Amino acid sequence: NVGTVQSEISKPSTTVPEQPSAPDDQPASGVSSGESSAPQDTETSKPQTASPAETVEVTEEPVINEDDAVTITNNGIAVVGTRALMLYGGSYSVGEQYAGVVNKFKEALGSDVNVYTMIIPTSCEFYNPESVKAYCGSQKDNIDYVYSMLKNTTGVDAYSALKKHVREDIYLRTDHHWAPLGAYYAAQAFAEAAGVPFKDISEYEQRVVHDYVGTMYGYTEDVVLKNNPEDFVYYVPKTVEYSTTYYDYILQDGKIVGANAPYNADFFIKFSDGNGMAYCTFMG
């Protein structure tokens, strides 16, 4: 039996943090008013254990144009050229809380269940130009720190798997999510760690929704993102058809006030070009 906990490492910032002053042995900081703060805990030192991603064999470096125009919004997003990056401001104390929750899962499930956790770095870890790096902490340092605190639980190294493919479309430019291809590489890393079968990507049919503009335009209203849509590429099994049960409901003041009867329909919904809901065509 396998228990899995997956986490993306940051969410949209809704508040403006004060500028931190981190010690030399902490992840980089230096965010001015309007950006997410980098890790700044001083009560916890960095782990001395070997980090999971130290053995990364980088096949390619990301293509970063240092001359691209950079705009930093007041909600912690940097628009670099035609790519939007959510600035990372995690902390070791939050990492400790997360590791504690995972350890409690393992304790509750017992020795008969293997528990895995896989923390996913966001795109700013790989695609920041030098002018933006000072505004972000190291996600790798924080991931390694979380994994060092796990007890009888396996931390899956998705970081290395993604870093090997940074010149491929593993993250979306106009959305805060990763792309389905990035999710595929991370899932492959999990399958290897768990020792479970995993199909080659050739077993899937590639589909494309053109002119996709994702959540980052909604967060920033930056016209550069709107005028530079991207292809949303996703993959569906060639030999298996999936359906799911849907519920439509009405929310009012955070409460469900109406719903219809459940109905079955295709899992992979076909959206037209330019439809911002295209991300719903896959589960990452």
Question: What function would you assign to each model-found segment?
Answer:
Residues 1-284:
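Extracellular glycan-modifying ectodomains
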